[in-house]
Protein backbone atom coordinates (compact mmCIF):
# COMPACT_ATOMS: atom_id res chain seq x y z
CA UNK A 1 0.00 0.00 0.00
CA UNK A 2 1.41 3.36 -1.05
CA UNK A 3 1.03 6.68 0.74
CA UNK A 4 0.81 10.18 -0.69
CA UNK A 5 3.74 12.55 -0.44
CA UNK A 6 1.99 14.74 2.14
CA UNK A 7 1.27 11.67 4.30
CA UNK A 8 4.91 10.58 4.12
CA UNK A 9 6.01 14.05 5.17
CA UNK A 10 3.61 13.99 8.10
CA UNK A 11 5.36 10.85 9.34
CA UNK A 12 8.75 12.46 8.70
CA UNK A 13 7.78 15.54 10.72
CA UNK A 14 6.53 13.44 13.64
CA UNK A 15 9.97 11.82 13.76
CA UNK A 16 11.70 15.19 13.82
CA UNK A 17 12.95 15.12 10.24
CA UNK A 18 13.24 18.48 8.42
CA UNK A 19 10.43 19.02 5.91
CA UNK A 20 9.07 22.12 4.16
CA UNK A 21 6.03 23.81 5.68
CA UNK A 22 3.06 22.64 3.63
CA UNK A 23 -0.64 21.79 3.59
CA UNK A 24 -2.71 19.27 1.62
CA UNK A 25 -5.71 21.00 0.04
CA UNK A 26 -8.91 19.71 -1.56
CA UNK A 27 -10.29 22.97 -2.99
CA UNK A 28 -8.83 26.07 -4.69
CA UNK A 29 -9.89 28.16 -1.69
CA UNK A 30 -8.03 25.87 0.72
CA UNK A 31 -4.96 26.16 -1.50
CA UNK A 32 -5.04 29.96 -1.33
CA UNK A 33 -5.53 29.84 2.44
CA UNK A 34 -2.58 27.45 2.74
CA UNK A 35 -0.37 29.96 0.96
CA UNK A 36 -1.42 32.63 3.45
CA UNK A 37 -0.55 30.34 6.37
CA UNK A 38 2.87 29.59 4.90
CA UNK A 39 3.70 33.23 4.32
CA UNK A 40 5.23 35.08 1.39
CA UNK A 41 6.04 33.17 -1.79
CA UNK A 42 7.26 31.66 -3.90
CA UNK A 43 5.42 28.41 -3.26
CA UNK A 44 5.44 24.96 -4.82
CA UNK A 45 2.15 23.24 -5.72
CA UNK A 46 2.10 19.48 -6.29
CA UNK A 47 -0.62 17.09 -7.44
CA UNK A 48 -0.99 14.24 -4.95
CA UNK A 49 -1.10 10.92 -6.80
CA UNK A 50 0.55 7.55 -6.26
CA UNK A 51 2.94 7.90 -9.18
CA UNK A 52 6.27 9.45 -10.05
CA UNK A 53 7.00 11.69 -13.02
CA UNK A 54 4.56 14.37 -11.87
CA UNK A 55 6.84 17.25 -12.76
CA UNK A 56 7.24 16.25 -16.41
CA UNK A 57 3.46 15.83 -16.67
CA UNK A 58 2.76 19.32 -15.34
CA UNK A 59 1.72 18.14 -11.90
CA UNK A 60 4.38 20.14 -10.02
CA UNK A 61 4.84 23.89 -10.42
CA UNK A 62 6.65 26.77 -8.73
CA UNK A 63 4.27 29.73 -8.38
CA UNK A 64 4.72 33.32 -7.24
CA UNK A 65 1.14 34.45 -6.64
CA UNK A 66 -2.04 33.17 -5.06
CA UNK A 67 -3.76 33.63 -8.41
CA UNK A 68 -1.39 31.05 -9.88
CA UNK A 69 -2.13 28.71 -6.98
CA UNK A 70 -5.89 29.02 -7.57
CA UNK A 71 -5.44 28.47 -11.32
CA UNK A 72 -3.32 25.35 -10.70
CA UNK A 73 -5.87 23.97 -8.24
CA UNK A 74 -8.82 24.68 -10.54
CA UNK A 75 -7.00 23.03 -13.42
CA UNK A 76 -6.01 19.81 -11.63
CA UNK A 77 -8.47 19.06 -8.82
CA UNK A 78 -10.99 16.51 -10.06
CA UNK A 79 -8.88 15.72 -13.13
CA UNK A 80 -6.58 12.75 -13.82
CA UNK A 81 -2.81 13.03 -14.06
CA UNK A 82 -1.08 10.80 -16.60
CA UNK A 83 2.64 10.14 -16.10
CA UNK A 84 5.07 7.54 -17.40
CA UNK A 85 4.30 5.49 -14.27
CA UNK A 86 0.51 5.39 -14.77
CA UNK A 87 -1.63 3.77 -17.43
CA UNK A 88 -3.34 5.79 -20.14
CA UNK A 89 -6.17 6.72 -17.78
CA UNK A 90 -3.84 8.25 -15.21
CA UNK A 91 -4.73 8.71 -11.54
CA UNK A 92 -7.28 11.08 -9.98
CA UNK A 93 -6.07 14.30 -8.38
CA UNK A 94 -8.16 14.79 -5.25
CA UNK A 95 -5.66 16.92 -3.34
CA UNK A 96 -2.75 19.21 -4.04
CA UNK A 97 0.12 19.98 -1.68
CA UNK A 98 1.04 23.64 -1.22
CA UNK A 99 4.55 24.14 0.21
CA UNK A 100 7.06 26.87 0.82
CA UNK A 101 9.62 26.89 -2.00
CA UNK A 102 13.14 25.76 -1.11
CA UNK A 103 16.41 27.21 -2.41
CA UNK A 104 18.32 24.14 -3.60
CA UNK A 105 22.11 23.95 -3.67
CA UNK A 106 22.43 20.18 -4.22
CA UNK A 107 20.14 17.16 -4.52
CA UNK A 108 20.84 13.81 -2.84
CA UNK A 109 18.99 10.51 -2.66
CA UNK A 110 18.28 8.38 0.42
CA UNK A 111 16.02 5.35 0.52
CA UNK A 112 15.60 1.84 1.86
CA UNK A 113 14.05 -1.45 0.75
CA UNK A 114 13.93 -5.02 2.00
CA UNK A 115 16.71 -6.96 0.25
CA UNK A 116 15.49 -10.53 0.05
CA UNK A 117 18.93 -11.82 -0.91
CA UNK A 118 20.58 -10.68 2.32
CA UNK A 119 17.34 -10.73 4.37
CA UNK A 120 18.15 -7.25 5.57
CA UNK A 121 16.75 -3.76 5.28
CA UNK A 122 19.24 -2.06 2.97
CA UNK A 123 19.71 1.70 2.79
CA UNK A 124 20.87 3.32 -0.43
CA UNK A 125 22.32 6.81 -0.79
CA UNK A 126 23.52 8.68 -3.84
CA UNK A 127 24.71 12.09 -4.93
CA UNK A 128 22.37 11.73 -7.93
CA UNK A 129 19.20 13.01 -6.26
CA UNK A 130 16.15 14.07 -8.24
CA UNK A 131 16.68 11.20 -10.70
CA UNK A 132 14.94 7.81 -10.70
CA UNK A 133 17.19 5.55 -8.65
CA UNK A 134 16.58 2.70 -11.11
CA UNK A 135 18.14 4.84 -13.83
CA UNK A 136 21.16 5.59 -11.63
CA UNK A 137 21.54 1.88 -10.81
CA UNK A 138 21.52 1.04 -14.51
CA UNK A 139 23.77 3.78 -15.84
CA UNK A 140 26.08 4.70 -12.93
CA UNK A 141 25.81 1.98 -10.26
CA UNK A 142 29.07 3.08 -8.62
CA UNK A 143 27.29 6.24 -7.46
CA UNK A 144 24.94 4.25 -5.20
CA UNK A 145 26.27 3.52 -1.71
CA UNK A 146 24.63 0.90 0.52
CA UNK A 147 24.51 -0.19 4.15
CA UNK A 148 22.54 -3.13 5.56
CA UNK A 149 20.71 -2.94 8.88
CA UNK A 150 21.53 -5.79 11.25
CA UNK A 151 18.21 -7.02 12.69
CA UNK A 152 19.87 -7.71 16.06
CA UNK A 153 21.36 -4.25 16.60
CA UNK A 154 19.02 -2.15 14.48
CA UNK A 155 20.24 1.01 12.70
CA UNK A 156 23.44 2.50 14.10
CA UNK A 157 24.56 6.15 13.88
CA UNK A 158 27.96 5.13 12.50
CA UNK A 159 26.19 3.73 9.43
CA UNK A 160 24.64 7.12 8.76
CA UNK A 161 28.03 8.80 9.13
CA UNK A 162 29.55 6.23 6.79
CA UNK A 163 27.01 7.07 4.08
CA UNK A 164 27.46 10.79 4.69
CA UNK A 165 31.22 10.56 4.18
CA UNK A 166 30.72 8.56 0.97
CA UNK A 167 28.45 11.33 -0.29
CA UNK A 168 31.18 13.87 0.40
CA UNK A 169 29.33 15.63 3.22
CA UNK A 170 31.24 17.56 5.85
CA UNK A 171 30.70 19.41 9.12
CA UNK A 172 27.15 19.86 10.36
CA UNK A 173 25.75 18.12 7.27
CA UNK A 174 27.17 14.81 8.51
CA UNK A 175 25.28 15.21 11.78
CA UNK A 176 22.08 16.25 9.98
CA UNK A 177 22.35 13.36 7.52
CA UNK A 178 22.87 10.87 10.35
CA UNK A 179 19.73 12.18 12.06
CA UNK A 180 17.72 11.76 8.86
CA UNK A 181 19.16 8.27 8.34
CA UNK A 182 18.26 7.16 11.88
CA UNK A 183 14.80 8.71 11.60
CA UNK A 184 14.05 6.97 8.31
CA UNK A 185 15.33 3.64 9.60
CA UNK A 186 13.14 3.84 12.69
CA UNK A 187 10.09 4.76 10.61
CA UNK A 188 10.81 1.85 8.26
CA UNK A 189 11.05 -0.69 11.07
CA UNK A 190 8.32 0.64 13.35
CA UNK A 191 5.80 1.05 10.52
CA UNK A 192 6.47 -2.31 8.79
CA UNK A 193 7.36 -0.65 5.50
CA UNK A 194 8.49 -2.24 2.26
CA UNK A 195 9.91 0.99 0.81
CA UNK A 196 10.93 4.42 2.05
CA UNK A 197 12.49 7.11 -0.10
CA UNK A 198 13.50 10.76 -0.03
CA UNK A 199 14.21 11.88 -3.56
CA UNK A 200 15.49 14.47 -3.44
CA UNK A 201 17.01 15.02 -0.03
CA UNK A 202 18.37 18.50 -0.67
CA UNK A 203 21.11 20.69 0.70
CA UNK A 204 19.66 24.20 0.83
CA UNK A 205 21.51 27.37 -0.05
CA UNK A 206 21.80 27.94 3.72
CA UNK A 207 23.69 24.64 4.06
CA UNK A 208 20.97 22.55 5.72
CA UNK A 209 19.30 19.27 4.77
CA UNK A 210 15.58 19.12 4.07
CA UNK A 211 13.31 16.28 2.89
CA UNK A 212 11.88 17.77 -0.27
CA UNK A 213 9.90 14.70 -1.34
CA UNK A 214 8.73 11.53 0.36
CA UNK A 215 7.61 8.11 -0.80
CA UNK A 216 6.41 5.30 1.46
CA UNK A 217 5.22 1.81 0.63
CA UNK A 218 3.67 -0.21 3.45
CA UNK A 219 3.80 -4.00 3.63
CA UNK A 220 0.21 -5.06 3.04
CA UNK A 221 0.71 -8.22 5.08
CA UNK A 222 1.50 -6.13 8.17
CA UNK A 223 -1.32 -3.59 7.93
CA UNK A 224 -3.33 -5.47 10.55
CA UNK A 225 -0.94 -4.07 13.17
CA UNK A 226 -0.66 -0.59 11.63
CA UNK A 227 -4.18 0.87 12.06
CA UNK A 228 -3.06 4.46 11.50
CA UNK A 229 -1.49 3.52 8.16
CA UNK A 230 -4.68 1.68 7.16
CA UNK A 231 -6.61 4.90 7.72
CA UNK A 232 -4.26 6.68 5.28
CA UNK A 233 -5.18 4.33 2.44
CA UNK A 234 -6.53 6.13 -0.62
CA UNK A 235 -8.48 3.59 -2.65
CA UNK A 236 -9.17 6.15 -5.37
CA UNK A 237 -5.53 5.71 -6.40
CA UNK A 238 -5.92 1.95 -6.81
CA UNK A 239 -7.33 0.00 -9.72
CA UNK A 240 -10.90 -0.84 -8.56
CA UNK A 241 -10.46 -4.39 -9.83
CA UNK A 242 -7.33 -4.82 -7.72
CA UNK A 243 -9.14 -3.49 -4.66
CA UNK A 244 -12.04 -5.88 -5.25
CA UNK A 245 -9.62 -8.78 -5.69
CA UNK A 246 -7.88 -7.99 -2.42
CA UNK A 247 -11.19 -8.34 -0.57
CA UNK A 248 -11.34 -11.95 -1.79
CA UNK A 249 -7.63 -12.58 -1.15
CA UNK A 250 -6.98 -12.76 -4.88
CA UNK A 251 -3.74 -11.36 -6.28
CA UNK A 252 -4.73 -9.33 -9.35
CA UNK A 253 -2.71 -6.93 -11.47
CA UNK A 254 -4.28 -5.29 -14.52
CA UNK A 255 -2.33 -5.34 -17.79
CA UNK A 256 -3.00 -4.01 -21.28
CA UNK A 257 -3.83 -7.16 -23.27
CA UNK A 258 -7.08 -8.95 -24.18
CA UNK A 259 -6.59 -12.48 -22.78
CA UNK A 260 -7.75 -12.84 -19.20
CA UNK A 261 -5.68 -15.24 -17.10
CA UNK A 262 -6.81 -17.14 -13.99
CA UNK A 263 -4.16 -19.34 -12.39
CA UNK A 264 -3.42 -20.90 -8.99
CA UNK A 265 0.10 -20.01 -7.93
CA UNK A 266 2.14 -16.89 -8.65
CA UNK A 267 4.95 -18.73 -10.45
CA UNK A 268 2.52 -20.65 -12.64
CA UNK A 269 0.66 -17.40 -13.34
CA UNK A 270 3.83 -15.72 -14.57
CA UNK A 271 4.69 -18.77 -16.67
CA UNK A 272 1.18 -18.73 -18.13
CA UNK A 273 1.53 -15.10 -19.17
CA UNK A 274 4.91 -15.88 -20.73
CA UNK A 275 3.57 -18.72 -22.86
CA UNK A 276 0.54 -16.67 -23.95
CA UNK A 277 2.96 -13.98 -25.07
CA UNK A 278 5.17 -16.59 -26.76
CA UNK A 279 2.25 -17.69 -28.94
CA UNK A 280 1.36 -14.16 -29.98
CA UNK A 281 -1.22 -13.28 -27.34
CA UNK A 282 -1.38 -10.35 -24.93
CA UNK A 283 -2.31 -11.07 -21.28
CA UNK A 284 -4.96 -8.75 -19.84
CA UNK A 285 -4.00 -9.44 -16.26
CA UNK A 286 -2.10 -11.40 -13.67
CA UNK A 287 -4.50 -13.24 -11.38
CA UNK A 288 -3.48 -15.78 -8.76
CA UNK A 289 -6.45 -17.42 -7.03
CA UNK A 290 -4.09 -19.16 -4.59
CA UNK A 291 -4.44 -22.62 -3.12
CA UNK A 292 -8.05 -22.22 -2.01
CA UNK A 293 -9.66 -22.03 -5.44
CA UNK A 294 -13.27 -22.45 -4.26
CA UNK A 295 -16.33 -21.92 -6.44
CA UNK A 296 -16.95 -18.57 -4.74
CA UNK A 297 -13.42 -17.32 -5.37
CA UNK A 298 -13.41 -18.60 -8.95
CA UNK A 299 -16.75 -16.85 -9.53
CA UNK A 300 -15.39 -13.60 -8.12
CA UNK A 301 -12.23 -14.00 -10.22
CA UNK A 302 -14.33 -14.32 -13.38
CA UNK A 303 -16.29 -11.19 -12.44
CA UNK A 304 -13.08 -9.24 -11.95
CA UNK A 305 -11.51 -10.45 -15.20
CA UNK A 306 -14.65 -9.78 -17.25
CA UNK A 307 -15.09 -6.29 -15.80
CA UNK A 308 -12.23 -5.38 -18.14
CA UNK A 309 -13.87 -4.53 -21.47
CA UNK A 310 -10.69 -5.43 -23.34
CA UNK A 311 -10.93 -9.13 -22.44
CA UNK A 312 -11.87 -11.25 -25.48
CA UNK A 313 -11.08 -14.70 -24.02
CA UNK A 314 -10.15 -16.25 -20.68
CA UNK A 315 -7.45 -18.84 -19.99
CA UNK A 316 -7.82 -20.84 -16.77
CA UNK A 317 -4.69 -22.78 -15.82
CA UNK A 318 -5.00 -24.89 -12.67
CA UNK A 319 -2.52 -27.33 -11.18
CA UNK A 320 -4.24 -29.73 -8.81
CA UNK A 321 -1.82 -30.47 -6.02
CA UNK A 322 -3.66 -30.22 -2.75
CA UNK A 323 -6.91 -29.25 -4.48
CA UNK A 324 -8.80 -31.72 -6.70
CA UNK A 325 -9.23 -30.75 -10.34
CA UNK A 326 -12.78 -32.17 -10.45
CA UNK A 327 -13.80 -29.79 -7.68
CA UNK A 328 -12.10 -26.94 -9.53
CA UNK A 329 -14.04 -27.94 -12.65
CA UNK A 330 -17.30 -27.76 -10.67
CA UNK A 331 -16.31 -24.28 -9.55
CA UNK A 332 -15.49 -23.16 -13.09
CA UNK A 333 -18.76 -24.56 -14.46
CA UNK A 334 -20.78 -22.91 -11.71
CA UNK A 335 -18.95 -19.63 -12.14
CA UNK A 336 -19.37 -19.55 -15.93
CA UNK A 337 -23.08 -20.31 -15.57
CA UNK A 338 -23.62 -17.74 -12.81
CA UNK A 339 -21.59 -14.90 -14.29
CA UNK A 340 -22.87 -15.41 -17.83
CA UNK A 341 -19.53 -15.50 -19.58
CA UNK A 342 -19.89 -14.49 -23.23
CA UNK A 343 -16.28 -14.96 -24.30
CA UNK A 344 -14.41 -18.22 -25.00
CA UNK A 345 -13.00 -19.90 -21.90
CA UNK A 346 -10.02 -22.23 -22.31
CA UNK A 347 -9.25 -24.45 -19.31
CA UNK A 348 -6.13 -26.49 -18.67
CA UNK A 349 -6.25 -28.83 -15.67
CA UNK A 350 -3.26 -30.86 -14.53
CA UNK A 351 -2.72 -33.03 -11.47
CA UNK A 352 -5.11 -34.54 -8.95
CA UNK A 353 -8.26 -35.86 -10.75
CA UNK A 354 -7.42 -33.85 -13.88
CA UNK A 355 -9.10 -36.35 -16.26
CA UNK A 356 -12.33 -36.32 -14.27
CA UNK A 357 -12.24 -32.53 -14.22
CA UNK A 358 -11.74 -32.37 -17.99
CA UNK A 359 -14.69 -34.74 -18.51
CA UNK A 360 -16.95 -32.57 -16.38
CA UNK A 361 -15.99 -29.52 -18.45
CA UNK A 362 -16.66 -31.37 -21.70
CA UNK A 363 -20.08 -32.59 -20.49
CA UNK A 364 -21.17 -29.20 -19.14
CA UNK A 365 -22.55 -27.94 -22.44
CA UNK A 366 -21.04 -24.53 -21.77
CA UNK A 367 -18.65 -22.57 -23.97
CA UNK A 368 -15.62 -24.09 -22.25
CA UNK A 369 -12.67 -25.47 -24.21
CA UNK A 370 -10.66 -28.17 -22.43
CA UNK A 371 -6.96 -27.98 -23.31
CA UNK A 372 -4.63 -30.98 -23.28
CA UNK A 373 -1.49 -29.10 -22.24
CA UNK A 374 -0.30 -25.61 -21.38
CA UNK A 375 1.01 -25.12 -24.90
CA UNK A 376 -2.32 -26.30 -26.31
CA UNK A 377 -4.15 -23.95 -23.95
CA UNK A 378 -2.09 -20.96 -25.05
CA UNK A 379 -2.55 -21.79 -28.72
CA UNK A 380 -6.30 -22.27 -28.34
CA UNK A 381 -6.90 -19.06 -26.40
CA UNK A 382 -4.85 -17.02 -28.88
CA UNK A 383 -6.77 -18.62 -31.75
CA UNK A 384 -10.07 -17.85 -30.00
CA UNK A 385 -9.15 -14.18 -29.71
CA UNK A 386 -8.16 -14.09 -33.37
CA UNK A 387 -11.48 -15.71 -34.33
CA UNK A 388 -9.93 -18.88 -35.71
UniProtKB/Swiss-Prot annotation:
Cofactor(s) recorded in Swiss-Prot or TrEMBL: Mg(2+)
GO BP of this protein: succinyl-CoA metabolic process; tricarboxylic acid cycle
Entry annotated with the keyword Hydrolase: no
Cofactor note: Binds 1 Mg(2+) ion per subunit.
Pathway involvement of the protein, from the record: Carbohydrate metabolism; tricarboxylic acid cycle; succinate from succinyl-CoA (ligase route): step 1/1
Keywords, sorted A to Z: ATP-binding, Ligase, Magnesium, Metal-binding, Nucleotide-binding, Tricarboxylic acid cycle
Molecular-function GO terms, alphabetical: ATP binding; magnesium ion binding; succinate-CoA ligase (ADP-forming) activity; succinate-CoA ligase (GDP-forming) activity
EC number of the protein: 6.2.1.5
Residue positions binding Mg(2+): 199, 213
Reactions performed catalytically: succinate + ATP + CoA = succinyl-CoA + ADP + phosphate; GTP + succinate + CoA = succinyl-CoA + GDP + phosphate
Database matches in Gene3D superfamilies: ATP-grasp fold, A domain (3.30.1490.20), ATP-grasp fold, B domain (3.30.470.20), Succinyl-CoA synthetase domains (3.40.50.261)
Residues of the ATP-grasp domain: 9-244
PROSITE patterns to which the protein is assigned, alphabetical: ATP_GRASP (PS50975), SUCCINYL_COA_LIG_3 (PS01217)
Cellular component annotations (GO), alphabetically ordered: cytosol; succinate-CoA ligase complex
InterPro entries for this protein: ATP-grasp, ATP-grasp_succ-CoA_synth-type, ATP_grasp_subdomain_1, Succ-CoA_synthase_bsu_CS, SUCC_ACL_C, Succ_CoA_ligase-like_bsu, Succinyl-CoA_synth-like
Binding site for ATP: 46, 53-55, 99, 102, 107
Cited function: Succinyl-CoA synthetase functions in the citric acid cycle (TCA), coupling the hydrolysis of succinyl-CoA to the synthesis of either ATP or GTP and thus represents the only step of substrate-level phosphorylation in the TCA. The beta subunit provides nucleotide specificity of the enzyme and binds the substrate succinate, while the binding sites for coenzyme A and phosphate are found in the alpha subunit.
Assembly notes: Heterotetramer of two alpha and two beta subunits.
Database matches in PANTHER family: SUCCINATE--COA LIGASE [GDP-FORMING] SUBUNIT BETA, MITOCHONDRIAL, SUCCINYL-COA SYNTHETASE BETA CHAIN
UniProt-listed NCBIfam families: PRK00696.1, sucCoAbeta
Family note: Belongs to the succinate/malate CoA ligase beta subunit family.
Protein name, entry field: Succinate--CoA ligase [ADP-forming] subunit beta
Provenance organism: Cronobacter sakazakii (strain ATCC BAA-894)
Amino acid sequence: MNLHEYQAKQLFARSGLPTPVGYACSTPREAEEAASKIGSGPWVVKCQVHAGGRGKAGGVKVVKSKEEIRAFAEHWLGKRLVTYQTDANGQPVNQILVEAATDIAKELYLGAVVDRGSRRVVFMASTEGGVEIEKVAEETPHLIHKVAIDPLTGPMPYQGRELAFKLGLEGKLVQQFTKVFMGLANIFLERDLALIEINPLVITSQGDLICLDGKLGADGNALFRQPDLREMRDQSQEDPREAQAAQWELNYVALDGNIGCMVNGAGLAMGTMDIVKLHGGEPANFLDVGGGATKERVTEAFKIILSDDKVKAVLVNIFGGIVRCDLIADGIIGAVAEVGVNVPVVVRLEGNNAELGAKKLADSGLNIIAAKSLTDAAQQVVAAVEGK
